[in-house]
UniProtKB/Swiss-Prot annotation:
A zinc finger (FPG-type) spans 237-271. The keyword Lyase applies. Binds 1 zinc ion per subunit. This is Formamidopyrimidine-DNA glycosylase. The gene is mutM.
Length: 274
């Protein structure tokens, strides 16, 4: 699933090529991708100018004028691609937006879990998913993020994945930041010192920034707005490396299910508190 860095990279690429352009037509090839009446979606979007493209958490948001927003929740396999000319739909193309300059935007989604909406300002602000999002981890300090979870008895990895606690963090960047800060994914936040929590969020911020610089992580499906793969997967220290030696101490990485997600960690470098 594309996480904060991947969606940020996509939004920057799309903004560069699409802001200021006008949507001429909408072709919906899979109605289940549009989480509202398809005819309302089409009528709202056609003829509107793209004024801004940005990200909130894992959402890609395309502003149309002052009071309309196309939101793309990419889920597992969603992609949004910009083309300079018309595009021939592929088997997994779900929506095609035609532009007045002859270009096109393609929403591609192999597994059909992605969700697309066209919402006005009021609808966006009242959408439960959107209004319950926590702070952006790159827009507040590590100290502020630490304060949000100090004393909570939940497992630290579950808190990192909780979008109401910190927006945009997923499995990849949770594992990477926990390893780099020496914290076991099953540790309870209440058992961690403020110093440890600040270090965790400092590492999370560093990992997210590095991933954005390296164009995101491509494991299976992710590509940027131009169709290019990311490179941060080559910088993984722990994610997906169960059974391999820890680069810091040589002990074999272990795996466990934490907060319903597969986790990889080093039991030597990330010790549980006795």
């Amino acid at each position: 699933m594309p996480e904060l860095p991947e969606v940020e990279v996509i939004s920057r690429g799309l903004a560069e090529s699409l802001e200021g352009k006008t949507i001429e037509s909408v072709k919906i090839l899979n109605h289940s991708s549009v989480k509202m009446p398809w005819y309302l979606f089409s009528s709202r979007v056609a003829g509107e100018k793209i004024t801004r493209i940005h990200r909130r958490a894992k959402l890609l948001i395309m502003d149309l004028g002052d009071d309309l927003h196309i939101t793309f929740h990419l889920k597992m396999t969603g992609r949004v691609l910009a083309h300079e000319g018309p595009t021939t739909p592929e088997p997994h193309t779900r929506i095609v937006f035609g532009l007045t300059d002859g270009g096109s935007i393609e929403f591609h989604d192999t597994r059909k879990f992605g969700e697309v909406r066209a919402l006005n300002n009021e609808e966006l602000q009242e959408w439960d998913f959107y209004k319950n999002l926590g702070p952006e981890p790159l827009e507040v300090t590590a100290e502020e993020l630490a304060e949000r979870i100090t004393g909570r008895k939940a497992q630290i990895k579950g808190l990192l994945l909780n979008q109401s606690v910190v927006a945009g963090c997923g499995n990849i960047y949770a594992d990477e930041s926990l390893f780099r800060s020496g914290i076991h994914p099953k540790a309870k936040a209440s058992d961690l010192s403020n110093e440890s929590l600040v270090k965790l969020f400092t590492e999370l911020q560093a990992v997210l920034k590095q991933a954005i610089q390296e164009n995101g992580s491509s494991i299976r499906d992710y590509v940027d707005a131009g169709g290019d793969a990311g490179g941060f997967q080559n910088s993984f220290k722990v994610y997906g490396k169960k059974g391999e030696p820890c680069p810091d101490c040589g002990k074999i990485f272990e795996g466990a299910t934490v907060a319903g997600r597969t986790s990889t960690f080093c039991s030597n470098c990330q010790k549980m508190k006795d």
